């Protein structure tokens, strides 16, 4: 995939995530493409959030499509997650329209 295609797919799948998991308790980062806040729970307004998840675009897209399980990606070191709510397994995979 080219960068523009990756950017569009990352943003559209993150939008699906925020629709499925509204809130601002978890910050999900897919550098350099996008970052969103989602998930129910305490929110933050300044500084580094308490619950942060970061991963590459290929990892995020594989999770969103159900090509890899959350636990497997986490155990493989493909996800950096910190905080008690830093877990997206209940929201994945996403329903992606072709």
Regions found by a protein language model. Give the residues of each.
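Feature captures hydrophobic
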Residues: 1-98
